[in-house]
């Protein structure tokens, strides 16, 4: 199998996934998954698509990710891995889609408006 490319995005994070046959090594920005993400919960979030199709130790994954924070990056990586797995084998698609791993979360931070403190919060109103 050749290398499969996929892209995942979430908020301002962009993850580029390079998936190939292997022993289950996952490296993010040339470091191991466990070193890159501090929390065990985030690591399990990244591995969810592989656990869903029971292929934890079948593919080597190299990931380049930039932008955002840990959570946004992890969700971008999860989407990218799910998309790459669908390219490898289209029969994975129904189970991944059912769990919602193929849905791009389109929510972004709302921009700050002038005359307001934040996106929607106004300055304190003084009647007199």
Curated annotation (Swiss-Prot):
InterPro entries: Ribosomal_Su5_D2-typ_SF, Ribosomal_uS9, Ribosomal_uS9_bac/plastid, Ribosomal_uS9_CS, Ribsml_uS5_D2-typ_fold_subgr. The keyword Ribonucleoprotein applies. GO terms for biological process: translation. Keywords: Ribonucleoprotein, Ribosomal protein. It comes from the Bacteria. Transmembrane segments: none annotated. GO terms for molecular function: RNA binding; structural constituent of ribosome. SUPFAM superfamilies: Ribosomal protein S5 domain 2-like. PROSITE patterns: RIBOSOMAL_S9. GO terms for cellular component: cytosolic small ribosomal subunit. The keyword Ribosomal protein applies. Disulfide bonds: none annotated. Belongs to the universal ribosomal protein uS9 family. This is Small ribosomal subunit protein uS9. The gene is rpsI.
